[in-house]
């Protein structure tokens, strides 16, 4: 993270869910394909999928701040809403289990743009 961005986050509570920087891999095959099309670019992939909690993913970056706020407020339960295959819901449940918070998921089986919406409620422990 650039120093100016780090400074902006300095006063915000955060719990460490990542354990250090995730690796960058150079996408040489994609670079070569683009070069054949006249685009000369260095392309790197940030491998947040290698974070060891709940299958990893970038959602853990925001959850570091959300969960720190929950803990700082003295709360013991998290409720979240999302689609049946929501990465946010999956990772929220994994983080709650890791830090000892109760978690309730409200999951939709259809797009929220169509009615009726069928929901499933899950309690994670």
Task: For the regions a language model picked out, list residue spans one by one.
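PLP-dependent amino-acid enzyme catalytic core
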Residues: 1-125
């Amino acid at each position: 993270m650039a120093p100016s961005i780090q400074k902006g986050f300095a006063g915000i509570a955060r719990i460490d869910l990542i354990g250090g920087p995730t690796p960058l891999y150079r996408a040489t095959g994609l670079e070569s394909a683009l070069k054949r099309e006249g685009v000369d670019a260095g392309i790197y992939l940030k491998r947040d999928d290698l974070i060891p909690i709940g299958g990893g993913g970038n959602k853990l970056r925001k959850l570091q701040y959300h969960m720190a706020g929950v803990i700082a407020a003295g709360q013991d339960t998290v409720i979240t809403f999302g689609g049946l295959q929501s990465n946010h819901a999956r990772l929220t449940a994994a983080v709650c289990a890791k830090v000892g918070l109760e978690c309730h998921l409200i999951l939709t089986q259809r797009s929220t743009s169509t009615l009726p919406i069928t929901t499933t409620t899950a309690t994670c422990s």
